[in-house]
Amino acid sequence: MQIKFLTTLATVLTSVAAMGDLAFNLGVKNDDGTCKDVSTFEGDLDFLKSHSKIIKTYAVSDCNTLQNLGPAAEAEGFQIQLGIWPNDDAHFEAEKEALQNYLPKISVSTIKIFLVGSEALYREDLTASELASKINDIKGLVKGIKGKNGKSYSSVPVGTVDSWDVLVDGASKPAIDAADVVYSNSFSYWQKNSQANASYSLFDDVMQALQTLQTAKGSTDIEFWVGETGWPTDGSSYGDSVPSVENAADQWQKGICALRAWGINVAVYEAFDEAWKPDTSGTSSVEKHWGVWQSDKTLKYSIDCKFN
């Protein structure tokens, strides 16, 4: 099994030569549930910049995210993987209005990618054809918007993010075809994996998604990101998955660092704990505890990759 896995891995990653990039998913609310302002975002980014200068978000209009985060990211030299929430028409229209209002106030280079939807297919909020239509809608919209220096956002790719298992399902193909870039989410915790199997499961999920996308795009030379992955440090167990600082540290080294060593770009979920979230999602009480740092910016475990 290991020989077969390594052979498949080598085939999928033939074009990879360098360490994969690191990004962090970033929450937009304070511990008390209020929305972060420009100065708070600047503080977050100033703290993160020694580790990464790429952040990922989920919506444009919610909490005035682009209005406040855009200027902060530009001031701190960050790029945003900017999420756009497409699931209902009213929300989608608010997202488009925010893009039109606030993209002109920042430089085009501040936006790394527009990501239409976050697991919209996994949750069955949209069909693949509906998501494809909204991806194309955003492509058309941003072509007509210019940044503060007069350059068009047409140069910025428009993609989507979804769970790895949905992406390998043939039903997702219309959305994959419409997207310039597709990010794949994978959480060994939510698959009830034991710690002994967690990193192997992560690699297998990611490679299946990458191979599917390479086949769909007709090339091994594609931009690819793991859009979310991580391990909770507290809360209840889920099957054989046990939240703890030790297990999160282990998954960082054996999963996240190892993926990056193979040249896979990873957006970690998430930078900071989000204390405002509910104690339980109805499945497991881990929602507050995914951060690499506590909400007060105390590091929980080493994130230096140790290849020894």
From Swiss-Prot:
Enzyme class, spelled out: hydrolase
Disulfide bonds: none
Subcellular localization: Secreted, Cell wall
GO CC annotation: cell surface; extracellular region; fungal-type cell wall
Signal peptide: 1-18
UniProtKB keywords: Cell wall, Cell wall biogenesis/degradation, Glycoprotein, Glycosidase, Hydrolase, Secreted, Signal
Record keyword Glycoprotein present: yes
Residue ranges that the Swiss-Prot or TrEMBL entry lists as coiled coil: none
Entry's family note: Belongs to the glycosyl hydrolase 17 family.
Protein's name according to its UniProt entry: Glucan 1,3-beta-glucosidase
Annotated source species: Candida albicans (Yeast)
Lineage, opening ranks: Eukaryota, Fungi, Dikarya, Ascomycota, Saccharomycotina
